[in-house]
């Protein structure tokens, strides 16, 4: 009986974790733990201050764009800025200042 109870508890714990993850409530420590497939074009995945994976405005560097307003403006190093490279195929990229 005790073994059955232990197995039931473990299965319950696993299923509750899967349900939380499927609802976007998966707790993360970094963006590498998040699944970006749920984000639309013009957004990028982040691990927010509450440690929950979510989508934020702006395509990441290398992501699709129609204009610079579609890009994540904080994605470049300090000595460069973001552009939407429409000549090279409509993607966000960094160029030196």
UniProtKB/Swiss-Prot annotation:
Keywords: Antimicrobial, Disulfide bond, Fungicide, Plant defense, Secreted, Signal. It is found in: Secreted. GO terms for biological process: defense response to fungus; killing of cells of another organism. Disulfide bonds join 28-47, 34-53, 39-55, 65-84, 71-92, 76-94. Residues 1-24 form the signal peptide. Its main location: secreted. One of its GO terms (cellular component) is extracellular region. The keyword Secreted applies. The keyword Disulfide bond applies. Belongs to the DEFL family. This is Defensin-like protein 301. It comes from Arabidopsis thaliana (Mouse-ear cress).
């Amino acid at each position: 009986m005790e073994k059955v109870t232990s197995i039931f508890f473990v299965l319950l714990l696993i299923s509750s974790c899967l349900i939380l993850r499927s609802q976007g409530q998966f707790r993360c420590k970094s963006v590498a733990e998040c699944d970006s497939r749920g984000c639309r074009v013009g957004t990028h995945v982040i691990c927010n201050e509450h440690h929950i994976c979510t989508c934020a405005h702006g395509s990441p560097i290398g992501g699709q764009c129609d204009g610079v307003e579609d890009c994540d403006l904080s994605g470049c190093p300090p000595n460069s800025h973001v552009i939407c490279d429409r000549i090279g195929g409509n993607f966000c990229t960094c160029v030196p200042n």
